Amino acid sequence: MAPAKNQENINQKLALVVKSGKYSLGYKSTVKSLRQGKAKLIIIAANTPVLRKSELEYYAMLSKTKVYYFQGGNNELGTAVGKLFRVGVVTILDAGDSDILTALA
């Protein structure tokens, strides 16, 4: 029961980031923000292809950015950020009022 509760908690924190913080969606913008050093946290969906996931992990390691692996697929991640389309990667640039950076550390 704890994983479902934890997932709901993360979804709420993501919704708060969308309302009050800065974020970007997608692989290309994530790599760009990682290379510029602007990303604070990246959230990767569970069904992201392995090669793409490893590239994101590599860039995150270079920029010393935290990586969180979302337990749902890209459909669920898109719904969590309030979009009606699939989202493979979410980059948190500024958490706003959310404590997602400390909660997922």
From Swiss-Prot:
The source's superkingdom equals: Eukaryota
For this chain, one GO molecular function annotation is:
RNA binding
Q: Which Gene Ontology cellular component annotation is one that this UniProt entry carries? A: ribonucleoprotein complex
**Which UniProt keyword terms apply here?**
Ribonucleoprotein, Ribosomal protein
What Pfam families does UniProt report for this protein, alphabetically?
A: Ribosomal_L7Ae (PF01248)
Which NCBIfam families does this one have? Answer: PRK01018.1 (NF002172)
Q: Can you tell me which family this protein belongs to?
A: Belongs to the eukaryotic ribosomal protein eL30 family.
Q: What is this protein called?
A: Large ribosomal subunit protein eL30
Name the source organism.
Kluyveromyces lactis (strain ATCC 8585 / CBS 2359 / DSM 70799 / NBRC 1267 / NRRL Y-1140 / WM37) (Yeast)
